UniProtKB/Swiss-Prot annotation, chains A, B:
It holds the Pfam family SepSecS. Keywords: Protein biosynthesis, Pyridoxal phosphate, Transferase. It catalyses: O-phospho-L-seryl-tRNA(Cys) + hydrogen sulfide + H(+) = L-cysteinyl-tRNA(Cys) + phosphate. This is O-phospho-L-seryl-tRNA:Cys-tRNA synthase. GO terms for molecular function: Sep-tRNA:Cys-tRNA synthase activity. It comes from Methanosarcina barkeri (strain Fusaro / DSM 804). Pyridoxal 5'-phosphate binds at residues 89-90, 196, 219-221. The modification N6-(pyridoxal phosphate)lysine is found at residue 222. InterPro entries: PyrdxlP-dep_Trfase, PyrdxlP-dep_Trfase_major, PyrdxlP-dep_Trfase_small, Sep_Cys-tRNA_synth_arc, SepSecS/SepCysS. Its EC number is 2.5.1.73. Belongs to the SepCysS family.
Length: 386, 386
């Protein structure tokens, strides 16, 4: 591409078509900015803005209160000993895997682990053993499966895995496994546990200490109303000196964080939304109630909710055999659902999906959820003769 | 910290004190957002905004034109075969080091390399050999030093280093080494070269192919008028399959990028500013002229510019013996300069520095640079009897 005026025209400011829609994509519902975060974004948008206030260590900046946020508020919020801000949950996971494991070591992942957990382990050179789930319809994860997996690794490789990970909840079905029991099983074998809380931290109460997780990863752009990429990482006292070890070349810089991570608008939007995020987490029971109400309405229409029931998270997976039937017959084929939802200003079911899809009810409230449910009902009706 | 209403009050939206000042911090001058980027920031601020348009691979998104940007515009701009967007220049460097080197391998760095190059190499488990510079006043980097360093590594470790890196320009003196000659020296030994262009890409013309660099790293928040953390990485055809290798667990995700990198406002501000960035790079001769004019005015006042002369970059290092003298005598001590500049609405010389400091003239234009130079002159005058 020659970079002339004509080709450059396609870049510059670009509108975001989905901005005004009701978005039920699980990736988006917890990442919508608060008003304070929108203001922070404009205020701190320039490149390295927070570095104007930095004496050499990002998380030691006193004003703006990054120090208080990272070293006082975050450990309290995650209920862990030490915390840092990272470039995302996957970067948090990689930092843990890369510092706790050595290439050739093993890691145990739950069978519903996010692809980024696999990729992070692969990047760290770790071999992967998965704990199977029970499959459809519950996708239940038996904590005892961790014992079996750890024993298998030990038998095959001569030593226990370096690390275990559990996804809490998983990103497909929104299942909340018994993380506390899993931590206890792992600890019986002296295997530390990393809790991937990308869909938990910032949405629902979660305590690393109560669970017994040695590490906890959260996502700012997924669940903490922040502009990404930004994440959080909590580590126990025992492992903090390893994960947050300092460079031998530069005494104040932490190796796994490459010195500095979120250094600008991202950390400032995380801080801006934090008071609201703390408050919304306290409102989690209402979110669960909304999710259950929504699931019940969907089931009344003949959709089948997969995963835990009654459900305890806003992320839900549905099977919609009737939509699949329709897609086989209508002109627009498998794109009919996406288009009919778009016409109703609803976004978030991936284009082309009909038989199976996931969605999230988080933060939408009963009124908007009602509009979504009514819209699905209308679409069913529209095609009732098909 | 108990997360109650009183403690949460310190978070939320926070003002940025330096927003209206003339900022000469080298970290800031190339990262100021364009108007288009400010608009993009607000439009695309929410968490995972671009993922609404993603079919599974970030850099394949057609609308917004991330695909065209990453696969057509960026390779042209960097003059390399393949490019990607990353979470920053240091993350670009780590991705290269981690995929090209194995723990225990060696890397050759120039003696003026940024700390993040050291930390990235350390994180990748690489041993570091540095190419010495000539020291004060020029800090000249002899390309032949790379031959010596490579030979030393080969002698000591039994094999050549996995990689060499050159900082172009360095972040202390703004020196532009003879990167083309360095590439040619490295290639004589079959050692690939990574060009750290965090202060070049987006400010001045730079061509990976003309230089002969196998890899080129750039920074969005440092030099491409983008809201960070965001960076770019260019790789030659030969090494692209290694650095951008796909996961064995997920066929579309690239391991070194952990699947996805800049997935939201950061990539959209990079794209928003891109047309202006392409244009400002064409204006580089004027920037160099401004830097030289500024340097001359500073030298007239008795400050001494260190590093290359005549200078060919906006980042400059000054020695100011007179300011040091003043700082020894005045009440405010070494903070007098910071405070006197602040009173004149100028920011960017680190608080407490007087004898040595660096600054950048980039993008400020003659008028603002005149104000800065006049202000330094006034401050000298203010203390002339001290």
């Amino acid at each position: 591409m020659k970079l002339d005026d004509s080709s450059l025209q396609k870049f510059g400011f670009i509108k975001r078509d989905t901005l005004g829609s009701i978005n039920i994509d699980p990736l988006q519902t917890g990442g919508r900015l608060t008003e304070a975060a929108k203001q922070a974004l404009v205020e701190w948008g320039d490149g390295y803005s927070v570095c104007d206030f930095c004496g050499g260590i990002l998380d030691q900046i006193k004003k703006p209160p990054i120090y208080d946020f990272v070293h006082k508020a975050l450990p309290e919020f995650l209920d862990c000993d030490e915390a840092r801000v990272t470039n995302g949950a996957r970067e948090s996971k990689f930092a843990v895997m890369h510092s706790i494991g050595k290439p050739g070591d093993w890691i145990v992942l739950d069978g519903l682990a996010h692809y980024s957990s696999y990729v992070a382990a692969e990047r760290a050179g770790l071999n992967i053993k998965t704990v199977p789930h029970s499959g459809s319809p519950d996708y239940y994860l038996d904590p005892e499966g961790y014992a079996t997996a750890i024993e298998e690794v030990t038998k095959e490789s001569g030593k226990p895995p370096a690390l275990a990970l559990v996804t809490y909840p998983d990103g497909s079905y929104g299942n909340l496994p018994d993380a506390r029991k899993i931590a206890s099983v792992c600890h019986e074998y002296d295997v530390p546990l990393l809790l991937n809380g990308a869909y938990a931290v910032g949405r629902m109460p979660v305590s690393a200490k109560e669970i017994g997780a040695d590490f906890i990863a959260g996502s700012g752009h997924k669940s903490m109303a922040a502009s990404g990429p930004v994440g959080v990482l909590g580590v126990s006292e025992e492992y903090a000196p390893i994960v947050f070890r300092k460079s031998k070349y530069n005494k104040v810089k932490e190796v796994e964080l490459l010195g500095c991570t979120a250094r600008g608008a991202t950390v400032m939007t995380l801080i801006a939304s934090f008071p609201d995020v703390v408050k919304r987490v306290r409102n989690w029971d209402q979110e669960v109630e909304n999710a259950r109400w929504f699931s019940a309405r969907f089931e009344e229409m003949g959709f089948i909710q997969r995963g835990q029931k009654p459900h305890s998270h806003d992320l839900m997976f549905f099977e919609a055999p009737r939509f699949y039937e329709i897609s086989e017959k209508v002109k627009k084929g498998r794109y009919f659902l996406y288009k009919d939802l778009k016409a109703r200003n609803i976004h978030g079911i991936k284009s082309g999906l009909t038989k199976y899809f996931k969605l999230s009810t988080f933060g939408l409230g009963k009124e908007k959820l009602g509009i979504v449910a009514d819209s699905f009902e209308e679409i069913l009706k529209k095609y009732e003769d098909v």
